[in-house]
Amino acid sequence: MEKQNIAVILARQNSKGLPLKNLRKMNGISLLGHTINAAISSKCFDRIIVSTDGGLIAEEAKNFGVEVVLRPAELASDTASSISGVIHALETIGSNSGTVTLLQPTSPLRTGAHIREAFSLFDEKIKGSVVSACPMEHHPLKTLLQINNGEYAPMRHLSDLEQPRQQLPQAFRPNGAIYINDTASLIANNCFFIAPTKLYIMSHQDSIDIDTELDLQQAENILNHKES
């Protein structure tokens, strides 16, 4: 098969925290719809695939004019990994070369412009990963890990706990919005983080991840403010 740039959107129908989360609407458009629109407007992809286990999600995806792959129940459970869902989608459509980008519907403030900018960091020759991230709200070196029997140890040095944050190295966390990989490398390594990994930095606001009703309200408020 010729090289293609594939977007895969994993959208389970059932969600324990927020029922039918991926179909919940924000300014009249479902979370799934916001992500599909971002993928389309980015103009980065030859094909956009929604992988789901539910008919309602499949119908919504088709309303936006994208392809649907039905995922078996064992790949759509609470414990199933995202990588297994992406590889299943690639195998189903017969894609094994080019690029694959995971876009999650729970990141509705990620735009087409974000995707284009992240794509510009991807190097086809090096074939590492590009992962979206945002600055850490709390620095990881200022934390303690429980090791055993109520004992705790610092992430690195006890002295880090008393250092001004500005004197510590910058820290970022993946925000779940964008994962870009060479398709063959992702299949071979069975993971999203492949060295060398480049980070595409997004703001805290644009990095909001929808897990609760409050998250949804906050995201809608941010979107309304952007559009006002």
From Swiss-Prot:
This is N-acylneuraminate cytidylyltransferase. Transmembrane segments: none annotated. Coiled coil: none annotated. Keywords: Cytoplasm, Nucleotidyltransferase, Transferase. Belongs to the CMP-NeuNAc synthase family. InterPro entries: CMP-NeuNAc_synthase, Cytidylyl_trans, Nucleotide-diphossugar_trans. One of its GO terms (cellular component) is cytoplasm. The keyword Nucleotidyltransferase applies. GO terms for molecular function: N-acylneuraminate cytidylyltransferase activity. The lineage of its organism: Bacteria, Pseudomonadati, Pseudomonadota, Betaproteobacteria, Neisseriales. It comes from Neisseria meningitidis. It comes from the Bacteria. It is found in: Cytoplasm. It is an enzyme of class 2 (transferase). Its EC number is 2.7.7.43. Its main location: cytoplasm. It catalyses: an N-acylneuraminate + CTP = a CMP-N-acyl-beta-neuraminate + diphosphate.
